[in-house]
Every structure is written in C-alpha cells, then in structure tokens.
Amino acid sequence: MTHCFIRALLRQPVERTPVWMMRQAGRYLPEYREVRERAGSFMNLCTSPELACEVTLQPLERYRLDAAILFSDILTVPDAMGLGLEFVEGEGPRFRNPIRGAADIHRLGVPDPEAELAYVPAAVRLIKQRLGDRAPLIGFSGSPWTLATYMVEGGSSREFRKVKCLMYEEPALMHELLEKLADAVALYLNAQIAAGVDAVMVFDTWGGNLDTEHYLAFSLRYAERVRQQLRLTGRGRIPAIFFTKGGGQWLEAMADAGYDALGLDWTTDIGSARQRVGDRVALQGNLDPVALYARPEIIRGEVRKILERYGRGSGHVFNLGHGVTPDIKPEHVGAMIEAVHEFSPAFHRT
C-alpha cells in the first residue's frame, strides 16, 4: 500500500496526518553533531554519500516520522556551476566567484547531475537501499529565484540589494540567469527522481521578499518552468511540493503552478489557506518552529490547534513552517511528532 505521506500529498484517503520536519536531520541532534565532527566540514558531509546517508536516516531511528529528506544543501547546484561554495564558521555560505555582471551570467552552464553533482544521486541510491520500505524519501532543490539571490549577493543577505538591483536595472539579464537555473534545477531533480526519490520539494526561501509583480515574474514563473520539466511518472506518481516562505498572499497563483502540494509558513492560517486553494493542492505545515522551545504540553496544544484549523479529511502533511532550529531539545521535537500521531486519526475517521 502506498505510504500515507504520498497519499496525503495526492489528496487520497489516509488514516492519520503524516508528519516530517524541514531540517529534521540537523544540528539539534547529538548524533548529527558527532557525524558532522567526523566529516571535518559541512561540504565533506554533503559530498560523501555514506555520511549523507547516515545523517538522513538518523531522525527516523529516533522518531516516528513519515518521510526522510535527503541530506544536502540547496547551494550545491550553483557550486556545480562554478561559483565555488564554501561555508565560513559564524558567517554561513559564501561563493568565491559570485555573479558580478553580464559576462558571468553568459558563461554559466547547466551542470550534469551525474557528473558535477554525482555525489547526490549516489547518496539517494544508498539511502533508498538502506531505507527500504520504512518511509518515502524526499529529494529537493532551491528555487531558481532563491539560488539566484545567493549567487548574485555572494552569500546570505538581509536586504538583497545586489540581486534586486539586477532585477530592476537589467531584467533581461535576470531572466537569462533564472532560465538557466530553472533548467539546472529541473535536471537536478530529475536525476534525484531517477535515482529513487519518492517525492520532490522546491524551496523558495526568499521569494517572500519580493512584491507581487516581481514575485510572479521572477520567482513563481521559474518555479513553474521547473515543474513543467519534472518527470513525475514511471515508478508510480512522484508528488512535487513548492514552498515560498512568506508567500501566503500568493497561494491562489501558486496553486496554479502545477505542484501537488504547497508548503505554508506559520504566518498563514492553514484553515483559510485550505478554503482559498480548495481541492487543487494539498497543504504542508505549519507550526511556528519557535513553538518547539515551549514546554511539551504547550507544543501538544499547538499541534492540536493546527489539526483543528485544517479540519477533517486528507490533503494535509504536518510540518513546521520553516526548518527546526539548532538549539531545540530533541524531546520537544518528539512531543510534536507524537502529538500528531495521537490527535490526527480523529480527523480522518469516516
């Protein structure tokens, strides 16, 4: 029987609401920190199929999760395009060769996932071998817009001055960059699908920093271009999830982009979101990650509220509204997951 995570994404009947977490394999887990130290660097961890497999499976050994998500980083794609990714302690990701003009964009090529990114499909194959039928595996990529923000800014940014200036002053150049990125992302996700992932997710972390006109033209347009190129049939139906952090105001437009499910951050009421999108897409989310700092009984209450707001029936995957933070207590994560298991069956009884 198809796993409840896949059925929920396809809005098919389920016996309970499935649950997983963005960044579920991460620094809040002591076992992850041990492997990270053994790896020597974050990039070593990402590029070693054996280590990536180990940390991908860690949260499933600890919790009753309904999906594993490939351990990797969204910036592996621009790294394979020649930008030279490095992670600086206390500073985050940084590119040695950021985009600084038209010539940099013109010379960008679309990387071959089985060559420049071969460690990713290799990790997928290894994870699937060891995961077996325990849970589906999610593959992922950053969205074209989100990848472009890092590539033009040279790393993380709060104001996005450089990338927005390029968008306003040289829109044709920005479109050229985003077209290449959309094709690269689609190729990358298709390689993950061919290697065995059961679902894919596109993370548009920074789309919510745009106004409506520019979100539709420079973010959602290229997420849709990615979706149009995805090969989602073959080994059964492969659901695709799209998540724009801060994108609640554009749900109706996002629901028309062709994805099976939309991720919600915690600023959008999931009940009203369900009314707005109707039966076009499933919804994923959307507990505030900061709620996990609260006492377990508070966490349980917040879980119940979200389940009640969504209401009865399938089409909901429980998740956080963004990634789990590094200093969360693992037992608080467990309280959230167990609350979903305990409370959600009541919303699926006929």
UniProtKB/Swiss-Prot annotation:
GO biological process: protoporphyrinogen IX biosynthetic process from glutamate
Major location category of this protein: cytoplasm
Subcellular localization, as worded in the UniProt entry: Cytoplasm
Annotated GO MF terms: uroporphyrinogen decarboxylase activity
Pfam families: URO-D (PF01208)
GO cellular component labels: cytosol
Its biological purpose: Catalyzes the decarboxylation of four acetate groups of uroporphyrinogen-III to yield coproporphyrinogen-III.
Subunit structure: Homodimer.
Family label: Belongs to the uroporphyrinogen decarboxylase family.
Protein name in the entry: Uroporphyrinogen decarboxylase
Species assigned in the record: Methylococcus capsulatus (strain ATCC 33009 / NCIMB 11132 / Bath)
Gene name linked to the record: hemE
